[in-house]
């Protein structure tokens, strides 16, 4: 099962012939992802990496039956690229690009809400279902097929959680980087709900950070809806108020969005919060052992 993507997912790349699109498409193909082509305006009719290039997403859909796209285009063009994909009937959009203007994302978010299309990102590492499909920039070799679902606002912190779950022998069902921007395509709740419904996912790792209220909202959802064990890590416990810490969304404003508040909300919902990333594997081991007893 897994969530969002599997071995049957057909993918195209928008920004296919650019430097980033080329490199990460090569990596995806090497992993076994069903990348069936790409889109680069004015280059339709040519081939790249042995795959067809189309001028528009609609042409790609009509010719390949693709259902997912990954976007590697500059921030100023992302809104149009995302909306083009939605209008063409793509069901899953993964946008890696950082720095999309907030007003552009507001328009995108409205379109997503109107159509029900799923978007992961922007400013994210992407999605991977180990040994089946990789859409994004994550290092493939640290992943192992297994039973832990991982959802995170951070890219590199996700990789640490992945490495620990691999080393512990648990592996991952699917790993989703929802991104660190203030307006994400998908929230923690969207992904937690999918993991709760997925029979292959036995436990969940959630990695949050300061800023916004996504973790507090997730805590309410977990308390009422999630029966599987959840381990969480919140980055930024020492962050000063009013200073952006890496991601655009990682800022404590008006005294809200602190790590302490988020940890308290999650613990009140029954989530096991670890103080260090290094403790994720051990915490999972204890939770999974106790859940079987």
Swiss-Prot record:
The active site is at residue 247. One of its GO terms (biological process) is tricarboxylic acid cycle. Keywords: Ligase, Nucleotide-binding, Tricarboxylic acid cycle. Substrate binds at residue 159. Its EC number is 6.2.1.5. Pathway: Carbohydrate metabolism; tricarboxylic acid cycle; succinate from succinyl-CoA (ligase route): step 1/1. GO terms for molecular function: nucleotide binding; succinate-CoA ligase (ADP-forming) activity; succinate-CoA ligase (GDP-forming) activity. It is an enzyme of class 6 (ligase). CoA binds at residues 17-20, 43, 96-98. One of its GO terms (cellular component) is succinate-CoA ligase complex (ADP-forming). It holds the Pfam family Ligase_CoA. It catalyses: succinate + ATP + CoA = succinyl-CoA + ADP + phosphate; GTP + succinate + CoA = succinyl-CoA + GDP + phosphate. It comes from the Bacteria. Heterotetramer of two alpha and two beta subunits. Succinyl-CoA synthetase functions in the citric acid cycle (TCA), coupling the hydrolysis of succinyl-CoA to the synthesis of either ATP or GTP and thus represents the only step of substrate-level phosphorylation in the TCA. The alpha subunit of the enzyme binds the substrates coenzyme A and phosphate, while succinate binding and nucleotide specificity is provided by the beta subunit. Belongs to the succinate/malate CoA ligase alpha subunit family. This is Succinate--CoA ligase [ADP-forming] subunit alpha. It comes from Haemophilus influenzae (strain ATCC 51907 / DSM 11121 / KW20 / Rd).
């Amino acid at each position: 099962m897994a969530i969002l993507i599997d071995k049957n997912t057909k993918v195209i790349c928008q920004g296919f012939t650019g430097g980033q699109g080329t490199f990460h498409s090569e990596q995806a193909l090497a992993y076994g992802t069903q990348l069936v082509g790409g889109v680069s305006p004015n280059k339709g009719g040519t081939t790249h990496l042995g795959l067809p290039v189309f001028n528009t997403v609609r042409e790609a859909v009509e010719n390949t039956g693709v259902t997912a796209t990954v976007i590697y285009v500059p921030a100023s063009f992302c809104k149009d690229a995302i909306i083009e994909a939605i209008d063409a009937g793509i069901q899953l959009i993964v946008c890696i690009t950082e720095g999309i203007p907030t007003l552009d994302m507001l328009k995108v978010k409205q379109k997503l809400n109107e159509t029900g299309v799923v978007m992961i990102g922007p400013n994210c590492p992407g999605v991977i279902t180990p040994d089946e499909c990789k859409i994004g920039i994550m290092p493939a070799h640290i992943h192992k097929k297994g039973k832990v679902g991982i959802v995170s606002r951070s890219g590199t912190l996700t990789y640490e959680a992945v490495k620990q779950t691999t080393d512990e022998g648990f592996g991952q069902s699917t790993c989703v980087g929802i991104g660190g921007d203030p307006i994400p395509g998908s929230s923690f709740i969207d992904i937690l709900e999918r993991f709760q419904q997925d029979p292959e996912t036995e436990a969940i790792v959630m990695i949050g950070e300061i800023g916004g209220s996504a973790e507090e909202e997730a805590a309410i959802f977990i308390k009422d809806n999630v029966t599987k064990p959840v381990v969480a890590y919140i980055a930024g416990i020492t962050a000063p108020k009013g200073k952006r810490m890496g991601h655009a969304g990682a800022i404590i404003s008006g005294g809200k969005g602190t790590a302490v508040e988020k940890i308290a909300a999650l613990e009140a919902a029954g989530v096991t919060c670890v103080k260090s990333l290094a403790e994720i594997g051990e915490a999972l081991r204890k939770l999974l052992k106790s859940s079987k007893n």
